[in-house]
């Protein structure tokens, strides 16, 4: 006998309640006209060797977090295969609220649903709102985040960034929200978009959209420059099973109103997270040419020496192997091993942490954005320093692979890059802090010799001017390089990803 999905969902809810596992939000079934319905046989998420795995159903069952009420993208991380970011404006708040409550809230994918293939939808739908979007809905509550309230365009100067290169729709506060769709095929996402647009009708207008996809074949999990991305995700205390060297943070660092969130939130906003979205173009052919032109002297082929320079700029080889553990040559087996590839602190016996750059430059991207022992934390993993400045990354590459013509001319002709997504409970301690206080700060990490470290060679910004970076050449750590901007921001927005109960509750009232 074949049981219907509705019966299975109801039976699961009854069993969970009987076992004491029920959360505050009742099981939901995808009977909304806004949903693309069907039975999923394979996961819409992809585990990649070397990255922290997708949260399991067992972890979800054991946690005290209300994972039925937390939108799935917040804690799933960088595991989506296909994704669409649909940015919209609200034209008719009353009609929008009606459909938000009746058609969208019932099908928003939770962490619980995404942890098990049996409960995953064909298309995972999440939704988040800008401050102007909340105001359009009549929600004036103070969420306790001034950066969110002001919007990302007003924050651009903090990052030494001009909005002249931004997508026009981001250069203001006109975007009210973003619907995030994830699946394993573009066709399913297209069907979901058609359903959403039919449901909302003229109550919303699409302002902009960005399609994104995991890279093909062996490049799955790698960003457009070719480096395995997302290894250093934090582990949430009481939810994730920490990997060796993984930063362990309280849930309140990522989830509003959770353990050790220092800000008092409106009751309806407990269980949400602030979403920083950035469209970051990557000039891959130009980046590769720069590495060849500036490859350090030494033995080995020109390409091998160029790869070494790239690894020292990032802090990892393309495989994900950290140069702090393998400073002169890639070790793909290490890169693919999540039990080893994050288990380091930058401290080495017999080497001075304040002056040694033979293992890893002070300016390397991953050292700038997670300094480990540089901030005086434990010299033994896991290093808990800077836990309050952790973010949960959930981005994905966008755009086509580099063409042979682009490689031959060393010139980008088709846009590609990273749809950067970061979740945190405080933007001022998360994304904003990492970019402004660490990546864009030439004197960070502190207490080093020489004191001027230089900007983050990957994401550091200098108002469009060349960035001076020190310590990248292994034979001369005092030498500096002037590095063009190979990651170009096309802007973004700050959103609040509310708890699911608020989507059909406070935001629809």
Swiss-Prot record:
Q: What is this protein called?
A: Dye-decolorizing peroxidase AauDyP1
Where found?
A: Secreted
Q: Where does heme bind?
A: 365
Catalytic temperature dependence: Retains >80% activity after incubation at temperatures up to 60 degrees Celsius for 10 minutes. Retains 50% activity after incubation at 65.5 degrees Celsius for 10 minutes. Activity is lost after incubation at 70 degrees Celsius for 10 minutes.
UniProt pH dependence = Optimum pH is 4.5 for oxidation of 2,6-dimethoxyphenol. Retains 100% activity after incubation at pH 2.5 for 4 hours. Retains >60% activity after incubation at pH 2-11 at 4 degrees Celsius. Retains >60% activity after incubation at pH 3-9 at room temperature.
Active site residues according to the UniProt entry: 229 (proton acceptor)
Q: Report the function annotation for this chain.
A: Manganese-independent peroxidase that is able to convert a large number of compounds, but its physiological substrate is not known. In addition to classic peroxidase substrates (e.g. 2,6-dimethoxyphenol), oxidizes dyes such as Reactive Blue 5 and Reactive Black 5.
- Enzyme group, top EC level? oxidoreductase
For this record, the Gene Ontology CC terms, alphabetical, are: cytosol; extracellular region
Q: State the Gene Ontology terms under molecular function.
A: heme binding; lactoperoxidase activity; metal ion binding; peroxidase activity
Query: Which chemical reaction does it catalyze?
Result: Reactive Blue 5 + 2 H2O2 = 2,2'-disulfonyl azobenzene + 3-[(4-amino-6-chloro-1,3,5-triazin-2-yl)amino]benzenesulfonate + phthalate + 2 H2O + 2 H(+); 2 a phenolic donor + H2O2 = 2 a phenolic radical donor + 2 H2O
Known glycosylation sites:
343, 383, 410, 476
What changing residue 438 to S does, per the record, is:
Complete loss of activity or at least greatly reduced substrate affinity, enzyme activity and catalytic efficiency
| Regulation acting on activity, per entry | Inhibited by imidazole.
Name the family the entry cites: Belongs to the DyP-type peroxidase family.
User: What is the residue range of the signal peptide feature?
Assistant: 1-22
Q: Which InterPro entries match?
A: Dimeric_a/b-barrel (IPR011008), DyP_N (IPR049509), Dyp_perox_C (IPR048328), Dyp_peroxidase (IPR006314)
Q: Which Pfam families match?
A: DyP_N, Dyp_perox_C
Instruction: Say which species the protein is native to.
Output: Auricularia auricula-judae (Judas ear fungus)
* Named cofactor requirement(s): heme b
């Amino acid at each position: 006998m074949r049981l219907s999905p509705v019966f299975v969902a109801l039976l699961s809810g009854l069993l969970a309640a009987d076992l004491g596992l029920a959360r505050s939000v009742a099981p939901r079934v995808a009977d909304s006209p806004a949903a693309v319905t069907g039975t999923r046989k394979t996961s819409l998420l992809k585990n990649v060797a070397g990255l922290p795995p997708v949260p399991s159903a067992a972890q979800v069952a054991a946690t005290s977090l209300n994972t039925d009420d937390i939108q799935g993208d917040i804690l799933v991380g960088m595991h989506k295969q296909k994704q669409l970011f649909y940015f919209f404006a609200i034209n008719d708040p009353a009609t929008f609220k009606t459909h938000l409550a009746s058609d969208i809230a019932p099908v928003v994918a939770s962490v619980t649903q995404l942890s098990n293939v049996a409960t995953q939808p064909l298309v995972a739908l999440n939704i988040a709102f800008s401050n102007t979007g909340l105001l359009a809905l009549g929600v004036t509550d103070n969420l306790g985040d001034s950066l969110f309230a002001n919007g990302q365009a007003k924050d651009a100067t903090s990052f030494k960034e001009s909005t002249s290169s931004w997508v026009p729709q981001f250069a203001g506060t006109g975007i009210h929200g973003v619907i995030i769709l994830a699946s394993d095929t573009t066709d399913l996402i297209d069907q979901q978009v058609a359903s959403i647009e039919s449901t909302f009708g003229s109550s919303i207008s699409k302002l902009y959209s960005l399609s994104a996809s995991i890279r093909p074949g062996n490049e799955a999990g790698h960003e457009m420059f070719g480096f395995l991305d997302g290894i250093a995700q934090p582990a949430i205390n009481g939810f994730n099973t920490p990997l060796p060297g993984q930063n362990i943070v309280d849930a309140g660092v990522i989830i509003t109103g959770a353990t050790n969130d220092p800000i008092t939130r409106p009751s309806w906003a407990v269980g949400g997270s602030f979403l920083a979205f950035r469209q970051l173009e990557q000039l891959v052919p130009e980046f590769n040419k720069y590495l060849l032109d500036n490859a350090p002297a030494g033995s080995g082929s020109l390409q091998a020496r160029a790869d070494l320079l790239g690894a020292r700029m990032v802090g990892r080889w393309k495989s994900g192997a950290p140069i702090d553990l393998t400073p002169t040559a890639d070790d793909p087996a290490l890169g693919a091993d999540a039990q080893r590839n994050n288990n380091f602190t930058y401290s080495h016996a017999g080497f001075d942490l304040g002056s040694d750059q033979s293992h890893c430059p002070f300016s390397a991207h991953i050292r700038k954005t997670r300094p480990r022992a540089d901030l005086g934390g434990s010299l033994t993993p896991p290093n808990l320093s800077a836990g309050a400045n952790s973010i949960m990354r959930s981005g994905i590459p966008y755009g086509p692979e580099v063409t042979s013509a682009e490689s031959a001319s060393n010139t980008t002709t088709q846009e590609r890059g990273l749809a950067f997504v970061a979740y945190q409970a405080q933007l001022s301690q998360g994304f904003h802090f990492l970019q402004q206080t660490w990546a864009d700060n030439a004197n960070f990490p502190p207490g080093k010799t020489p004191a001027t470290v230089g900007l983050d060679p990957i994401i550091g910004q200098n108002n469009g001017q060349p960035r001076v970076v020190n310590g990248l050449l292994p034979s001369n750590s005092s030498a500096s390089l002037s590095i063009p901007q190979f990651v170009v921001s096309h802007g973004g927005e700050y959103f609040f990803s509310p708890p699911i109960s608020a989507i059909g509750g406070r935001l629809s009232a």
